[in-house]
């Protein structure tokens, strides 16, 4: 079993670009069907580590879904981001859904 550093609903930052994002899914290793030429350059060790589906905002404030290696992310310590309230709301909504009890029929 591979342990992931970040959890679903957690806010993270891209370690090089500084973009704020929210983890929406986790793969235990690289799992896209057909890698692009840029993704082919990723070494095997990085491919074997967890990869994250992260929602970030583009320059126009529109949501963009990205696929990033664990090494490309760092924890975000602040919970409130007045400059990007939609990312705060997305993180809260996901965490709330994960904590909500599920009814069984």
UniProtKB/Swiss-Prot annotation:
Role summary: Involved in the degradation of certain denaturated proteins, including DnaA, during heat shock stress.
Main location, first listed in the record: cytoplasm
Subcellular location, record wording: Cytoplasm
SMART domains tied to this protein: YccV-like
Keywords: Cytoplasm, Stress response
Protein family according to the UniProt entry: Belongs to the HspQ family.
InterPro entries tied to this protein: Hemimethylated_DNA-bd_dom (IPR011722), Hemimethylated_DNA-bd_sf (IPR036623), HspQ (IPR022866)
Organism for this UniProt entry: Salmonella choleraesuis (strain SC-B67)
Keyword Disulfide bond applies: no
The keyword Lyase appears for this protein: no
One Gene Ontology term of the molecular function aspect: DNA binding
NCBIfam families attached to this UniProt entry: PRK14129.1, yccV
Domain of life: Bacteria
Any Pfam family the entry gives: YccV-like
Protein's recorded name: Heat shock protein HspQ
Gene Ontology CC: cytoplasm
Gene Ontology biological process: response to heat
Record-annotated membrane-spanning stretches: none
């Amino acid at each position: 079993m591979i342990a992931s550093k970040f959890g679903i609903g957690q806010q993270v930052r891209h370690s090089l670009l500084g973009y704020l994002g929210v983890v929406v899914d986790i793969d235990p290793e690289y799992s896209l069907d057909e890698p692009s030429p840029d993704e082919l350059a990723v070494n095997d060790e990085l491919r074997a580590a967890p990869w994250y589906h992260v929602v970030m905002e583009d320059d126009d404030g529109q949501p963009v879904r990205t696929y990033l290696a664990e090494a490309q992310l760092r924890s975000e310590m602040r919970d409130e981001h007045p400059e990007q309230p939609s990312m705060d709301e997305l993180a809260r909504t996901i965490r709330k859904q994960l904590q909500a009890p599920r009814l069984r029929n």
